[in-house]
Design a protein with these regions (language model features):
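Short beta-to-alpha linker loops that shape the active-site pocket of alpha/beta-hydrolase fold enzymes
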Residues: 1-3, 69, 201-202
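Active-site loop/oxyanion-hole signature of alpha/beta-hydrolase fold enzymes
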Residues: 1-43, 52-59, 207, 212-218
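Conserved catalytic-core motifs of eukaryotic protein kinase domains, centered on the activation segment
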Residues: 7-13, 74-77, 180-181
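Flexible "cap/lid" loop of the alpha/beta hydrolase fold
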Residues: 49, 53-54, 58-101
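Conserved alpha/beta-hydrolase catalytic His-Asp/Glu region
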Residues: 74-81, 96-161
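Conserved serine/cysteine hydrolase catalytic core
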Residues: 137-188, 197
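Catalytic active-site module of serine/aspartate enzymes centered on a nucleophile-bearing elbow/loop
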Residues: 192-226
Length: 226
């Protein structure tokens, strides 16, 4: 995604979710793709929902969304955002933390969510956490912080009901950020949606359960065994 490839941006445009959705449209145009199957994980799911808002689904055949809420920020009437408790004030504080120490703020957000293993890994500062800290510290934080502000300003709940193509939803049963209530909300809001919750895996169910995910995708596309 724009601003996330480990290389600096070549132009000053802010990598908002709207800009990333247009990037997807530009990609489809460049390769002359129609009836595409598109997978969006985390920020990618938000980008795909923005794409649907801006461009519709006429060029898409099927959609796959992985472990994401249609609105990240919570309020008194919306408990299905980040950790069920991430209101505007907490988001503003998080953005301040990103400005101060981008890498550590991201690591803490992941660690102090719903997944106790992630918390233990952070508190023990295991090698994987150290490596992640080094990778995050090497990034230019400015475009990523601007991107986050764009993502947390978005609300795609109204988009879900407009989706006319089949959707596969894959959520982690031990997601760092979302409970099953979020998964069920998304499933119930999309007219033709199939939900799989992978038990005991975090925000990246497609990575922890690669073989199952591949089978589920092939079955969803009609290319599975039998």
């Amino acid at each position: 995604a724009r601003g996330h490839g480990g290389h600096p941006l070549k132009n000053p445009s802010v990598p908002t979710v709207e800009r990333m959705a247009r990037d997807l449209q530009n990609l489809l145009d460049h390769y002359r793709l129609d009836q595409a199957v598109v997978v969006g994980h985390s920020m990618g799911a938000l980008t795909l929902w923005q794409y649907l808002r801006d461009f519709g689904d006429s060029r898409l055949a099927k959609l796959i969304f992985i472990d994401q809420s249609p609105r990240l920020v919570t309020d008194v009437g919306w408990p299905n955002g980040i950790c069920g408790d991430f209101d505007a004030a907490r988001n503003a504080a998080f953005i301040d933390d990103l400005e101060t120490d981008f890498a550590e703020a991201v690591l803490r957000l992941v660690a102090f969510g719903h997944n106790p293993r992630a918390r233990a890994a952070y508190e023990d500062d295991i090698p994987a956490i150290q490596n992640a800290r080094q990778r995050l510290a090497a990034l230019d934080p400015r475009p990523l912080i601007d991107c986050w502000a764009s993502l947390t300003a978005a609300d795609y709940r109204d988009v879900l009901a407009t989706i006319t193509v089949p959707a596969l939803l894959v959520y982690g049963g031990a997601s760092n950020f979302y409970g099953t209530g979020t998964a069920h909300y998304v499933r119930d809001s999309i007219p033709n949606a199939l939900l799989h919750v992978y038990p005991d895996v975090d925000h990246a169910p497609h990575l922890w359960e690669r073989e199952r995910f591949a089978r589920d995708v092939l079955d969803f596309l009609g290319d599975g065994p039998g």
